[in-house]
Regions:
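Extended acidic/polar, glycine-enriched regions
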Residues: 211-214, 240
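Internal insertion modules embedded within essential enzymes
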Residues: 214-227
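Extended, well-ordered protein cores
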Residues: 1-168, 172, 178-185, 229-531
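Extended charged low-complexity segments that act as oligomerization/scaffolding linkers
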Residues: 193-196, 201-206
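Contiguous, function-dense segments enriched for cysteine-driven chemistry
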Residues: 147, 205-209
Length: 531
């Protein structure tokens, strides 16, 4: 039995990349909060970095060379997890949504309102709460207020509380009366909930916050113009052209991560050449051997301990002249030099390498193909060791950015920044170490399957649904980014295989991730058909 105890509000580094990153909303026992932008982070706590040359090149291709460092999320190391020092570390959070309500009397108020009191407890986050100080219905004590679980968001990443004063008064109003939340049913459905102003008597049912009802005849009662608010940046954009939509607190479409992810592949050259390539962001400023001891003392040269200063400087000069390490060393001499093409070097490494590869980041060997599958599968690779490097570069709301960083201009326009400053120079990242199975399918069989008339008809159905999806979101052209039946085949196989792997090997399904290599013969770097 796992007896490890977790603190309230504790997150794994991987969760900050995919589930609860900057701009996302996290539920605590008594309220919710939003992960703040990088200006609010304690930069002094960020020391360990993610070193992977291909990852940095891919980030630079998307955000520019201003990004100098990719830091790992700090992890508390104190033996006493409840010490003041350890409790002062972590990821900054602000209360969001700010509108709260009393479950006893229904009074609604913002967190800073005079009727709301904050109960703080430095050592017990589960005891932190907002109390209604002037509840007229509570018999003894001050009830704990809970978040009003309705928000407004737009496809350009803005999010805010519903303007409840506007909502109740059905437009702009000078009325400052208190608002009350009233449930008339037992289900808590929006049709059975009403918001009322006690001063002027105006009221509005909660269902009015959601448009497109009654066959599209019901108009939303929220403002038609997005206010452009980014609470994680403490900033408001002007002139947002997005259409605000009401969402529920905790909705899965309130935050989608945009991450750049690569598998570390072997590099040509010696071990030292590979280390220099991985740490080039720090080493490109080294102009003579005398500066290397300072880099050692600053902890910027992990893994270099067995090499002398002269050896390190010689490797730096080799790399600077272009004679050092390059990706794809394990038999992948044709690895792509395009830093935005993240899959091609990996595909070449797994499909064109020798039968066995041993590297500090990647170890794999080719396995025999079962007789029943030799016609369909070209290669099976058992990956005993791999390292995946990731960097969070932004996020979207309402619209998912898609799989594996292959975004079009529409999605890039909707990417929400992680910091206010356009000159911000660092990101957060993560490294995952694990194992895996690579399967390369027979290209001729995949191509023949895709060309069947029944599959072509199915492809037309998928394309029609894909175009309708993009049309509803005003994304042009409507048929852009359609993955094709090749990808659908590989994706379907991948999920079926992961499910069976979880059942047969004892892995948690959440611990298994897929990586799909799908390109048609005419695509750059194609064809690819593997998982």
């Amino acid at each position: 039995m796992n007896r490890e105890k977790f603190k309230i509000g504790e997150l794994r580094p991987s969760q900050l990349m995919h589930s609860f990153g900057v701009g996302s909303i996290v539920d605590f026992p008594n309220f919710s909060g939003i992960i703040m932008g990088f200006e609010d982070w304690q930069v002094g706590e960020l020391r360990a970095q993610v070193y992977e040359r291909r990852l940095r090149e891919a980030v630079h291709a998307r955000l520019g060379p201003r990004i100098k460092n990719i830091y790992k999320v700090p992890v508390p190391v104190s033996e006493n997890p409840f010490s003041r020092e350890e409790n002062s570390k972590g990821v900054p959070v602000e209360v969001f949504p700010r509108w709260l309500r009393c479950p006893v009397c229904g009074r609604m108020a913002q967190a800073h309102d005079h009727v709301v009191e904050f109960q703080s407890d430095f050592y017990s986050p589960d005891r932190m709460k907002f109390r209604h100080a002037q509840c007229t219905k509570a018999s003894g004590g001050r009830p704990t207020m809970i978040p009003v679980r309705r928000l407004v968001a737009c496809e350009f990443g803005h999010i805010d509380d519903v303007d409840w004063v506007y909502f109740v008064h059905q437009g702009e109003s000078d009325c400052k009366g208190p608002l009350y939340w009233k449930d008339y049913g037992v289900t808590g459905a929006a049709e059975e909930t009403e918001i009322e102003c006690k001063t002027c008597g105006k009221k509005q049912k909660l269902i009015a916050a959601f448009g497109d009802g009654d066959g599209g005849k019901r108009k939303s009662a929220i403002p038609e113009q997005c206010n452009g608010h980014h609470p994680h940046l403490r900033h408001t954009d002007t002139g947002c052209k997005g259409q605000p939509r009401t969402i529920v607190l905790g909705a899965s479409n309130s935050w989608f991560s945009m991450t750049v992810s690569v598998i570390a592949i072997p590099v040509e050259g010696s071990e030292l050449d590979g280390l220099v390539a991985d740490h080039w962001t720090n080493l490109n400023g080294v102009i003579n051997v005398a500066t290397i001891p300072a880099f050692r003392q600053g902890g910027l040269l992990p893994g270099f301990e067995k090499f002398s200063d002269d050896q390190i400087f010689a490797a730096i000069e080799r790399y600077r002249s272009g004679a050092g390490a390059s990706p794809g060393g394990a038999g992948s001499a044709n690895a792509s030099s395009d830093s935005t093409d993240l899959k091609l070097p990996e595909w070449q490494t797994f499909t064109k390498s020798r039968e066995r590869v041993e590297d500090r980041s990647l170890s794999f060997r080719s396995m025999p193909i079962p007789d029943d599958f030799k016609a369909d599968i070209s290669r099976i690779v058992r990956v005993d060791r791999l390292r995946e490097a990731q960097a969070l570069i932004g996020f979207t709301r309402l619209l998912s950015p898609g799989e594996f960083g292959e975004w079009d201009d529409d999605v890039n326009e909707m990417r929400v920044p992680l910091a206010r400053s356009k000159d911000h120079s660092w990101l957060i990242g993560n490294e995952n170490k694990g194992e895996g199975i690579f399967i390369q399918f027979n290209e001729n069989r995949v191509k023949a399957w895709c060309e069947q008339s029944a599959i072509q008809q199915r492809s037309a159905d998928f394309l029609r649904a894909h175009a309708e999806f993009r049309s509803r979101r005003n994304l042009e052209p409507n048929d852009a980014l359609f993955p094709g039946m090749r990808y659908i085949l590989l994706h379907s196989f991948s999920h079926a295989f992961m499910r069976q792997l979880a059942l047969s090997a004892g892995y948690s399904h959440a611990a298994i991730r897929e990586r799909i290599y799908s390109r048609a013969p005419g695509d750059p770097g194609g064809p690819m058909a593997g998982v």
